[in-house]
Amino acid sequence: MRKLLRVLLACLAAPLLHCAWAQPATGKTEVLWLGQSAFRISTPGGKVIVTDPWLKLNPLTPAEYKNLQALGKVDVILVTHGHWDHFADAPELALLNQVPMHAPGDMNQTVGLLGILPPNLVPRFNKSGTITPAPGIKVTAVKAEHSSVIVWKNPSTGKDESHPGGEPVGFIIELENGFRIYHMGDTGLFSDMRFIAEYYKPDLVLMPIGGHFTMGPADAAYATREWLKPKTVIPMHYGANPLGRGTPTEYMRALGDSGTRVLPLKPGEKAEF
């Protein structure tokens, strides 16, 4: 009872966001899709990881999550590259939670130099580098076959400017219980996907399937069947942009009977592991 009272008193003295109860340690992993490449991952140890947070203007994001406070207390923010549909809401989310935005090193250098975020919220790391952004959580940056640029409106001129976004990456996210998630970011096919699968052995792959800017259904099916061979795939990066026309149905048809379980979530739906 005394412990509960201390928690309640602390909440009364803290900002609204931090008065929310901490995510309970359930021993399970919950993966909530928020549209495009944005996910809210609740870890077995009670941490919350948010990837590629483009939410406010994302046509697929459920209305409740367009308010960033609805995500609750966020412990780790991961951004795969500088394109707006992956980076847009990351700075605000970092400031709101006072946690770093982890992104490719050269991208974060640009974000810091432009004053978008203060230096303590833009740590640098790069491909093959492994960090521990929260106790029990390991994140390794791996190759992605894409591009990256930051488009920023200069407050002095009111004009958009293009700035270096570093090299795009994917992330191997290892949780407290050893469960590994491969968030591929935006990528086309590259044969080192086979190496990533052999070396990191991901249990779950978050895979772009929309095409035009990333792998389409046929390419994604080839990567799944021939190189990655994961237990489970959640399709992502489709439907938010009219050019990303690939669908989970097309992907699953191209994949056939591969032994991989495909979970085509709707925005706002979650899978539990």
Swiss-Prot record:
Q: Which SMART domains does the record match to this protein?
A: Lactamase_B (SM00849)
List the InterPro entries: Metallo-B-lactamas (IPR001279), RibonucZ/Hydroxyglut_hydro (IPR036866), UPF0173 (IPR022877), UPF0173_UPF0282_UlaG_hydrolase (IPR050114)
Keyword Hydrolase attributed: yes
GO molecular function list: hydrolase activity
Mind listing the UniProt keywords for this protein, alphabetically? Hydrolase
- Gene3D superfamilies under this entry? Ribonuclease Z/Hydroxyacylglutathione hydrolase-like
Q: Does the keyword Hydrolase apply?
A: yes
Q: Which domain of life is it from?
A: Bacteria
A Pfam family matched by this chain, by name?
A: Lactamase_B_3
- Membership in a protein family: Belongs to the UPF0173 family.
Record's PANTHER family?
UPF0173 METAL-DEPENDENT HYDROLASE MJ1163, UPF0173 METAL-DEPENDENT HYDROLASE MJ1163-RELATED
Protein name listed in UniProt = UPF0173 metal-dependent hydrolase Bpro_4324
